[in-house]
Structures are given as structure tokens and as C-alpha cells.
A protein has these predicted regions:
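C-terminal interaction modules of eukaryotic adaptor/scaffold proteins
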Residues: 272, 276-348
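Residue register within tetratricopeptide repeats
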Residues: 28, 32, 63, 67, ...
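Internal alpha-helical scaffold/solenoid segments in large eukaryotic proteins
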Residues: 120, 206, 217, 225, ...
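Pentatricopeptide repeat
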Residues: 1, 12-19, 34, 49-54, ...
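Short coil/turn connectors between adjacent alpha-helices in alpha-solenoid helical repeat scaffolds
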Residues: 4-15, 19-30
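Alpha-helical repeat scaffolds
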Residues: 34-38, 69-76, 104-108, 139-146, ...
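Inter-helix linker motif
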Residues: 11, 45, 64, 79-81, ...
Length: 348
């Protein structure tokens, strides 16, 4: 009897057996043993579900037997083409999460050869996996394929590719990528603009940073906490106190609440200029008795690092069970610590 004709009846017992065989396949590394498992599944007279077939395919992928994968996919297409798209999706996801990019590419090629198109979810996942496990050059190729497919790169993909550039300190290339994605996209909020500002701030290109900030506002985008903190970190590291002060005023005008990063930028800038006594004036427009929070995008730290006050405060907060911390209290502790360290230095 033909295999396709045999898959007609299904009972809970048979289905359970098929699922058990599929799970067992994940533990096998021998092609011969896998063939035995696949043959048993065919004889069960049950059409395997997408997850079970995906397990078998992933097992074959781990030993590099793509001919067998192709045979399995074409057999499923003949019998139950409706589940084939789910099989592709699950298999691509499984290979991608394990960093088996070559296997993932082979599955996508097989998918296209069988007449299935790559949808938005699969295309974006493809880029994410390359961003996680591939080289920067491979990431750029993956994005190029997505772009040619006219699939819109979603926010998670934008962040992943941006992180790949940041890891390599390729800030100019990051800016080019973001412009290619499109600065006018509103479906991802301020993400693209904030990352563009970050690409200039990380290279301390202050004139370009200011110019693009003005363009962002003129384009109708309202600055958020990440926008202000990218600029504040750059101003702080460059000891541009007046620019930092103006940024805080703008922040207050926009009703954007500062976080630990914002306060840290001010503290570090004033401490570097030996102006600790002026901190009370610096915070006159802010409520430093408010509860501590850290809401800044972690990608910003990857590019700019964390300031001394921020890092020191995280240690204090991490070692404390008290949840009622204010910025003023953290600043007092930090100033005492710096005062003691300076005393020890001069005593030596």
C-alpha cells in the first residue's frame, strides 16, 4: 500500500506513539536509526503533526542529511500540504535558535522551491538569527535579502542589527543602515531616530548630534527619555555643562521624567569639573527626592557605557533590601564615598 494512502486513520493511541517517536528522534545522531524512526512513523497510519515532522527534520539537519529532509518535505506536500508551512516555520526557528544558519538557509531555499513565499514573521526571524549568530557581513547580506523581498524590518530586527553594528563599533555604518531603513517610520516610535543620535553620540560628533536632534523634532517626533539620555551622556562625557543644563530644561518642558542615567550624567559631569557643591543648583529643576528608576534602553549602554555614579549606584541598590531609595540619598552616599577615597589618596 502507498504511504500516502496509508495515512487515513488516526486514534489518540497512534497519535501519542508518533509524538513519542518524534521526541526520540531528537536524541539520535545516526542516519540509520533516524530512518528506522521515520519508517515507524510512516507505518503508523497517522499523519504526523507539524511539530513531530519538524523534530525529525531538525535531527536530520544536525547530521547534515539534506537529501532526506527534501524527501520528507516533498512527501508531506503530497499528503498534507496545509501543515507544510507550519513545518517550515518551526524548522527555520529551530535551526535559527541553535545558530545553524546554513541549515536554516537550506530550509528556506527548499521552501521557496516548493512554491511557498517567505512571510514577514519568517523574514524578520531570519534576520534576528543572523544578527545573533552571524558575522556583521552576513547580517548585512541577510538584511539585503529581506529588503529585496519587500518585507518591512520590524523593531526587534532593527534593534538586533543595530546591536551588531554597535558591537563592532561601526557607528558610521550604523547611521547608514538606519537611514536605509527609513527615518520617517512611525510604527517603531522614536527607535530609529534615537539610534541615529546614538551613532553620533558614541563617536562624540557633537555638531552632527545637535543637527540631527533638531531634524528629529522638525520631522514631528517628540523626544523621549532615551532621546534626552543619549544627548546627556555625550554632554556629560565631554563636560559640556551648559548644553547639559539646557537639555534638562528641555526635558522638563516636554514633561519627560528623568531616571538614574539622567541624574548620573549630571553628577559625573559636575564631579569631573570639581563642582560637587553646585549639584544642588544643577538639580533645581528636577525632583531629586523622587524614587529611583532605570528606564533607559540597554542598547545605549552598549555604545556609551555607564557613568561612574550609575555603576556605583547599581552596586548600592543591588546590595540593599530597602526599596525606598531616592536620587538624593544615592547622591549623598556617592559623594561621601568620593570624599573618603580622596582623603585616602592624599594621605598616601
Amino acid at each position: 500500500m502507498d504511504v500516502c494512502d496509508a495515512w487515513k486513520r488516526e486514534s489518540p493511541k497512534q497519535k501519542s506513539r508518533v509524538e513519542g517517536l518524534a521526541k526520540d528522534s531528537g536524541k539520535l545522531v545516526s542516519a540509520e536509526k533516524l530512518k528506522v524512526v521515520w519508517s515507524e512513523m510512516l507505518k503508523s497510519e497517522v499523519v504526523p503533526d507539524a511539530e513531530s515532522v519538524s523534530r525529525i527534520i531538525n535531527s536530520y539537519g544536525s547530521i547534515g542529511d539534506f537529501d532526506m529532509i527534501s524527501k520528507i518535505l516533498r512527501l508531506i506536500q503530497l499528503k498534507d500540504a496545509e501543515i507544510l508551512h507550519d513545518i517550515f516555520r518551526l524548522t527555520i526557528s529551530c535551526f535559527g535558535k541553535r545558530g545553524q544558519l546554513e541549515c536554516m538557509d537550506c530550509i528556506i531555499k527548499e521552501m521557496v522551491s516548493l512554491g511557498y513565499s517567505v512571510d514577514s514573521a519568517t523574514g524578520n526571524a531570519y534576520v534576528l538569527y543572523y544578527s545573533s549568530f552571524g558575522t556583521l557581513a552576513e547580517v548585512e547580506v541577510a538584511y539585503g535579502r529581506l529588503k529585496r523581498s519587500r518585507i518591512l524590518l520590524e523593531g526587534e530586527g532593527i534593534r538586533a542589527i543595530s546591536f551588531a553594528y554597535i558591537k563592532e563599533n561601526k557607528f558610521y555604518a550604523l547611521g547608514k543602515f538606519l537611514r536605509n531603513v527609513g527615518l520617517c517610520r512611525r510604527d517603531v516610535g522614536n527607535l530609529i531616530w534615537n539610534l541615529l543620535l546614538l551613532s553620533y553620540a558614541a563617536d562624540f560628533k557633537m555638531k552632527s548630534l545637535q543637527r540631527e536632534f533638531v531634524r528629529m523634532v522638525e520631522a514631528g517626533f517628540r523626544p523621549d527619555l532615551n532621546t534626552f539620555n543619549v544627548r546627556a551622556l555625550a554632554f556629560s562625557k565631554m563636560s559640556l555643562l551648559w548644553d547639559l543644563h539646557l537639555s534638562l530644561e528641555h526635558m522638563t518642558h516636554e514633561s519627560v521624567a528623568p531616571d538614574l542615567v539622567t541624574y548620573g550624567c549630571v553628577v559625573d559631569a559636575y564631579m569631573d569639573r570639581r563642582l560637587a557643591r553646585n549639584l544642588k543648583f544643577a538639580f533645581s529643576k528636577l525632583n531629586w527626592n523622587s524614587a529611583v528608576s532605570v528606564l533607559t534602553d540597554p542598547l545605549i549602554f552598549e555604545a556609551m557605557g555607564k557613568g561612574d555614579f550609575h555603576s556605583s549606584s547599581e552596586v548600592v541598590l543591588g546590595n540593599s533590601t530597602n526599596e525606598d531609595w531616592t536620587y538624593k540619598r544615592l547622591i549623598d552616599i556617592y559623594l561621601k564615598k568620593r570624599f573618603r577615597s580622596n582623603q585616602i589618596f592624599w594621605n598616601y
